[in-house]
Amino acid sequence: GVKYEDAKKILENVGLSVDGIKLLKTIHFLTESELAFPNIENITKGYICDLTTYYDFKSDIQKALDVLVEQKQLLLTNSNYKITTDEESKLLEEMNDFDVELFIKKRDMVNYLKKTGIFNQISTINDDAQPYKFNILTDQEDEISSSSNKQLGFTVYSLFNINGSREDFIEDLKLQTQYNKDNITLVPNIDSFQEIDRLISDIKKYSHMEEKYSTESDNTIKAVIREFSTIKEEAEKSLVSKLSDAYLNGSLIYMYDEILLNGDSFKGSVNETQRKLIKNIYTKRLNSSLSDSLAPKILIENNNDKLSRYFSSNDFAFFDKNGNFVGDSLKVVEEIGSKLTRLIDGKSLEQDLSMAPWGYTFGTIITTLASLFRAGRLIVKYNNQEYFSYSDKSVQEVFTNTTKFKLASFKSLNKSLSS
């Protein structure tokens, strides 16, 4: 028939030695006999005369099948091949006339990239027992895993935006970003780009056909659209897998360094680079942090000589053994103190000091303020009233309730000797 002749011509045109007529007859026989599935293994066995030549022929037959699927002579579902019917050919032709625009492909790629889940493992990293959430965006600022902390930047390049040679692209990128301390860039491997591009287009085309014929009453057409849905699902699985591979085997660029990634080293290599970034931008970070549960304890402790026992780290040696405040030269007191020259609300204080270069935790900020308040070094303004005494019960809730802390304001009270 015409289909058999077409298959023969198509394979001859691409220079394959597989006989198109014989190949389609083999598939037809397997489909009709129902003795074995028409998959690559059985088609190869049916095509050859001598079983010892199986491996000589298999890769060429696979290439021939791929070409015929691409040319819509065959349909591939669940690893089985079948010759397209006239109805299928007609619908496939109609489907092929549907054009998928580049901006749609770019958008769909981002959605499927999120579905790979590979960025979940690197979106938040713990360093010195403190979590840092990275702001992961594409190079066109599509969100993959966003964070309110824009200083922890992570750019993922779209496969569609790597122009020319990948090596040249990476060299240019290294030069452009060599002084950017606050951003890491991931460039995918582009070996499978053509296939990924084709899968994204095909999936969109199958979806278009599903929508167009969703209310179809003709059973023959309905059956073909059901087949299309199955093919689409398989294409989606294949796409997610290929996208994962492209990014897991990409290159990481940070301050002129290029780190080659693979599936096994991906998380470790990315985390190591993230720690470098954290170290580079949080230059005033402390070696340890405090828990916010300490703040109220400092205010209600009756024995001054017990105050120093609440703090084990030298970063927070606010009190001596007698309960005298001796923390003026501590880094944390100097840094927080520099923000307290005028009244500042708790919310702004936390927002500022949690960012680079400090990276202080909420617990560190609130407990340091509680210590300053205990030492008579702080004015707390709350509910339009100024408080100077730490023992005042009505102000203590500022240090036990996050919302109330954010609404309260704080200012240094400088202790100076009066004559």
Model-assigned labels for residue ranges:
Residues G1-S419:
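Extended alpha-helical interface modules used as scaffolds for assembling large macromolecular complexes
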